[in-house]
Amino acid sequence: GDRTLPISDAEAAMKMARDSADVWNLNPYDIGIMGSSAGGHLASTIATHTRPELRPNFQILFYPVITMDKSYTHIGSHDNLLGKDASAELETEFSNEKQVTKETPRAFIAYSDDDKTVPPANGVNYYLGLHKNHVPAVLHIYASGGHGWGIRENFIYKNEMLNDLSAWLRSFKAPRKDAVRVVCVGNSITYGARIKNRSHDSYPAVLGVC
C-alpha cells in the first residue's frame, strides 16, 4: 500500500484538532496522539517525523511497533508498510527509535513481558532514545497479558495500567486549567462506534459540533 496515506490522515487529524480547538474547548498546545500495535508505529511516526505545527504534544503507546529492524520488528507491519524488499535506508527512516530528537514529545509506553507479537524491545529502545535526548518518558512492562490487551476486559493489570496512565497525565501541567486534555480523532471514536445514539452521545455531539 501507500505508506504516505496513514501518515497524511494522522497529520490531517492533528490539524483538524488544532483548527477546531476553540469550538471543541481544547488547548491546541496540549493535544496528544495514541496508538496500539501497528497504530503505535503510526503514532510514534507522527511524533518523530512531522512538522512542528502538526506534532502532538504527547504520545500514548500501547504495545507499539517501533522499529523496522527485521531482527525484532513485527514482520507483517514491516512488509505492509515498507514492502518485503525495503532498503536499509528506508528501514532506518521508519525505525522510530532512531528518529528521536529533543523535539519529540513526551511518551507513555506500555507492554506485557510475554508479548510474542511485538517484542517489548521495541519500546525499550524507543524509551532509551527518548531518555538520551532528555525527552520525559515512562515505560511500563506488565508481567503478563500478551498482545492486544487494550481491548480485553480480562487483562489482569487493567486497573494498574489505568492508574499508571492517569498518574502520568497528571504529572505534567496542562497549559490551561479549563481545557479538555485529550482529543480522540478517528473513525471509531469520532463516529461513535458501539454507541446506540451517535447523534446525541458521540464525542462531537456532546460538544455540539455535529
Where are these regions (language model features)?
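Short beta-strand/loop motif that positions the catalytic acidic residue
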Residues: E103, F108-Y111, D115
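Mobile cap/lid helix-loop segments that gate and shape the active-site cleft of serine hydrolases
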Residues: P64-Q99, P105
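Primarily recognizes the serine-hydrolase "nucleophile elbow" in alpha/beta-hydrolase
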Residues: A12-H74, E91-T92
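Conserved alpha/beta-hydrolase "acid-adjacent" motif
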Residues: K116-N125
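Serine-esterase "nucleophile elbow" of acetyl-processing enzymes
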Residues: P175-C210
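Catalytic nucleophile-loop/oxyanion-hole region of alpha/beta-hydrolase
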Residues: G1-P28, R152-E160
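C-terminal catalytic histidine-bearing segment of alpha/beta-hydrolase fold enzymes
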Residues: V124-R176
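Short beta-strand immediately N-terminal to the catalytic nucleophile in serine-hydrolase-like folds
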Residues: I33-G35, A110, V185
